[in-house]
């Protein structure tokens, strides 16, 4: 669909998850992926050229890690944020069936897991992941700007695709480099 004409009510509908307005909009324009890459970088510092964003429409695989020894590990769980939150709080020592009605499942009847590359023309927001974004206060500027823009979109003040256009303008602004790249005192 033409993103320019997407209304807040449409952007909030997620096919697999029930989430709040803000995170649903971040998911619909792929800002959630941008924020996830920044989060991964902060937790596990890596060369910013060494990541790849992929889409998993089934929303069951939440992370994939490729190891130098040739192994690959997947983090697979149902579309319920209770699972990662409970495991973080209880340090992976929780029987999730006590908290959730969902049981662990795996694709049935030979159903395969599907993955696809992000179409950067359709989701240009992922192009904001330049090396500058990882530096010092870059993530803070991105997140704060996005918060304001999503709120403006929800209130009908800007269009859906304006979120990206304004964010891009922020990161192209000469003052971004002036403030974001400096180390905090």
What are these regions (language model features)?
Residues 1-185:
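Catalytic, metal-anchored helix/loop core of enzyme active sites in primary metabolism
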